[in-house]
Curated annotation (Swiss-Prot):
Zn(2+) 1 binds at residues 67, 100, 163. Homodimer. Pathway: Amino-acid biosynthesis; L-lysine biosynthesis via DAP pathway; LL-2,6-diaminopimelate from (S)-tetrahydrodipicolinate (succinylase route): step 3/3. This is Succinyl-diaminopimelate desuccinylase. It catalyses: N-succinyl-(2S,6S)-2,6-diaminopimelate + H2O = (2S,6S)-2,6-diaminopimelate + succinate. It is an enzyme of class 3 (hydrolase).
Length: 376
């Protein structure tokens, strides 16, 4: 099992599948799943390749979810080893996607192969939802697949997303939820003019400043037992022509909320717009909901994951909702229990991304135990 997980991880890493390209990764995965009796369905939406694979029909459905796409490697000269030539060195496997998340995909496959061999007649269905658009716009990937499944009443009951959830050692952290993400693109309009004649102009930077200060200092909520307080962060500001003697005619500001289950996107929008209106601004505001918050409470999936990590790693894991968003935000609203469980995330998206080789074996074992404890 050990060499098989490592071997398959290397095969996947060697494919330079930068978003939204898949570069044949899903074909490799599909071939192995087909050999285990899975029905394969390729769902291609515009530039994105997705794979929906299911073994069985009509019973409770457990699903592994993941992505074959990776972020660009940057300057390959900064890498110790070529990013798409998987290299083992001093106990680690190096390559783009080693931790995020081709190592997880390999572990999912080998765990499933072993589980089906040991329990060929288990009374449950197993599925795989794999996309090539997780690191990018996330428009034509998991979101579209879930919409398609919902249209034909295919419902996932339990889902493990293979995102690199661990912090210091494999299994120390699992994500049983994520904060919501809401982005606002705000344009405040003024009147352009000469800096020496401010009475003939209207400076939108000055107009926005008090309102922006209020937004920054607002206490949006106090969080709860599962989520930290909601945060507001300005990410981009652009104003002016570049000339030092011109009052700008507009200011463009982008900001983001990471919000808890104490709030909804609509409540945030109402509060932001009330503050802007109070300051009598002339503005345009566009919103983009990247995903609502979700939380998987204690239940069958959480308990199976906790027991599997205790069995294979020898310690109790910690449930967390910290960090960014993942494709779990598209799966959880359907009613599925969702957990993110994967390798250590210390090197993801970095030069010299790597995963501990022994963690690939252990992760496969943890996934196997999750299947066993949940479905048997």
């Amino acid at each position: 099992m050990s060499s098989e997980t490592l071997k398959f991880a290397r095969e996947l890493i060697s494919r330079p599948s930068i978003t939204p390209e898949d570069e044949g990764c899903q074909q490799l995965i599909g071939e192995r799943l087909a050999a285990q009796g899975f029905n394969l369905e390729s769902m291609i939406f515009e530039d994105t390749t997705n794979l929906w694979a299911r073994r069985g029909q009509g019973r409770k459905l457990f699903c592994f979810a993941g992505h074959t796409d990776v972020v660009p490697p940057g300057d390959i000269n900064d890498w110790q080893f070529p990013p798409f030539e998987p290299t083992t060195h001093e106990g680690y496997l190096y390559g783009r996607g080693a931790a995020d998340m081709k190592g997880s995909l390999a572990a999912m496959i080998t765990a499933t192969e072993r589980f089906i061999k040991d329990y060929p007649n288990v009374d449950a269905d197993i599925g795989f939802l794999i996309t090539s658009d997780e690191e990018g716009p996330f428009i034509n990937g998991t979101k579209r697949v879930i919409e398609t499944l919902q249209e034909r009443n295919e419902n996932i009951d339990w889902c493990i997303v293979g995102e690199p959830s661990s912090t210091d050692t494999l299994g120390d952290i699992v994500k049983n939820g994520r904060r919501g993400s809401l982005t606002g693109d705000l344009t405040v309009l003024g009147i352009q003019g000469h800096v020496a004649y401010p009475h003939l102009a209207k400076n939108p930077v000055h107009d926005l400043a008090p309102a922006l200060s209020e937004l920054i200092n607002e206490e949006w909520d106090q969080g709860n037992a599962s989520f930290p307080p909601t945060t507001f962060q300005v990410s981009n500001i652009q104003a002016g022509t570049g000339a030092g003697n011109v009052i700008p005619g507009r200011i463009d500001t982008q900001f983001n909320f990471r919000f808890s289950t104490e709030l909804t996107a609509e409540k945030i929008k109402q509060r932001v717009e009330a503050i802007l209106d109070k300051h009598s601004l002339k503005y345009h505001l566009q919103w983009k909901l990247n995903g609502p918050p979700f939380l998987t409470e204690s239940g069958a999936l959480v308990e199976a994951v906790q027991a599997a990590i205790e069995h294979e790693c020898g310690f109790s894991t910690t449930l967390s909702t910290a960090g960014g968003t993942s494709d779990g935000r598209f799966i959880a609203p359907t009613g599925a229990q969702v957990i993110e469980l994967g390798p250590v995330n210390a090197t993801i998206h970095k030069v010299n991304e790597c995963v501990k080789i022994s963690d690939l074996d252990k992760l496969s074992d943890v996934y196997y135990r999750c299947l066993e404890k949940l479905l048997c």
